[in-house]
Amino acid sequence: MQRIIDREIEKTIDMKRLGQLVPPYCVVRQYDNIRGKTLKAVMGKYTVLILLWNIHDKRHRTLDKPGHFFVISTRGPEPCVVFSSTGMTPKKELFITQSDPTLLERILPKGTVYNNKKLQINRNSNTCWRFAILYAHLAPMGLKKFQSLFTHPSVHLSNS
């Protein structure tokens, strides 16, 4: 059973297939290819946007390595949410991927809420797309409720 789980965890996904697995209010794009001066211009008619950060070298050339999917949502109770399964700030992830940080700085509105809970517990980079699909479908519930789905309740045992 563990072999099956390990094999499934290793599976990657391409952007076309990912786009087929998300709700109609969601679109999947490459971070490097989005254009627009505002979040509304970038998202168009969609309320959830899954973006792929490609990995770059220090000269900002795209490398042939798996990237990282993250989500921007205006669909839930919060005005705008940036969700990454790593729980890292976009600034840190952009530094790791060597992607252009000015794009997010330019389009994200004030008051944007960021996921700071680490949900991707293994070091496998192929896990993020699964969380992106989940968040895309469940974005209407909001970030806090989504995070609570992955929080273990504390159990207290007593012998009285």
Labelled PLM ranges:
Residues L39-K40, P101-E105, S158-S160:
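Short amphipathic alpha-helical segments and helix-helix/interface helices
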Residues Q30, N115, Y135-S160:
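Contiguous terminal or domain-adjacent regions
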Residues M1-C80:
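Cysteine protease catalytic domains with a Cys-His-Asp triad
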Residues T47-K144:
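Cysteine protease-like catalytic core of ubiquitin/ubiquitin-like
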